[in-house]
């Protein structure tokens, strides 16, 4: 059995790490490189960096900080932010990123996923999906341009359909960003994760809602995800990564201990 992954998420804006709640009201948390170093030392298995306004602003993620991060950490990291071509992805990888995450650009150009997978291999291509549960319609909808609350829009894709589509196109991993739970710290949406798990045959990463160590355990065991991504509990020092891993190991989760 492959070890489960603990993945801190760093949302980037104007060269700094920020964090909001339900993808809104973002506040500055700290500087990129020191935070990346801290999480690597604490025992993170991987890091994810989202330049959250790159797509909505029509630009590509700033690559200068990518090189600085690559110099100071020795764990894999994934980068997202306005990547719309093989050439742009190649530049990000050349600066040190191990994986490319595609979100809004893939909704405009789904075959971008295929072109990237053909060039770099499916193991390098992550489909990041921002999913919102619409209570009135009683369904999960994919959202786009979520880094800017004034430009966020609901797409025509229902989440489960898009999960199936990105796999067909060549995504080697899926990160499910559950917007209703984001920053609330009340637990992952286990019902949605179970539904997605049934149709997801590549590694599935849960994102949005972690507030306690038990929340990580529930997602890993009850929803059978391959990894758990979180931000607030790590940024605010509510949970230490090494202590979290020790707890999960005691609970029977296959996990890498440093």
Curated annotation (Swiss-Prot):
Give the EC number(s) listed in the UniProt record. Answer: 4.3.2.10
| Chief place of localization | cytoplasm
Any one Gene Ontology cellular component term annotated for this protein: cytoplasm
Please list the GO terms describing molecular function: imidazoleglycerol-phosphate synthase activity; lyase activity
The entry's keywords: Amino-acid biosynthesis, Cytoplasm, Histidine biosynthesis, Lyase
Family matches, as InterPro entries: Aldolase_TIM, His_biosynth, HisF, IGPS_HisA/HisF, RibuloseP-bd_barrel
Biochemical pathway:
Amino-acid biosynthesis; L-histidine biosynthesis; L-histidine from 5-phospho-alpha-D-ribose 1-diphosphate: step 5/9
Under catalytic activity, the entry for this protein gives:
5-[(5-phospho-1-deoxy-D-ribulos-1-ylimino)methylamino]-1-(5-phospho-beta-D-ribosyl)imidazole-4-carboxamide + L-glutamine = D-erythro-1-(imidazol-4-yl)glycerol 3-phosphate + 5-amino-1-(5-phospho-beta-D-ribosyl)imidazole-4-carboxamide + L-glutamate + H(+)
Compartment list: Cytoplasm
Which Pfam families does this entry report, sorted A to Z? His_biosynth (PF00977)
The superkingdom of the source organism is Bacteria
GO-annotated biological processes = L-histidine biosynthetic process
Residues annotated as the enzyme's active site = 11, 130
| Quaternary context | Heterodimer of HisH and HisF.
Family designation: Belongs to the HisA/HisF family.
- Biological function: IGPS catalyzes the conversion of PRFAR and glutamine to IGP, AICAR and glutamate. The HisF subunit catalyzes the cyclization activity that produces IGP and AICAR from PRFAR using the ammonia provided by the HisH subunit.
Q: What is this protein called?
A: Imidazole glycerol phosphate synthase subunit HisF
What organism, scientifically named, is this protein from? Baumannia cicadellinicola subsp. Homalodisca coagulata
Lineage of the organism? Bacteria, Pseudomonadati, Pseudomonadota, Gammaproteobacteria, Candidatus Palibaumannia
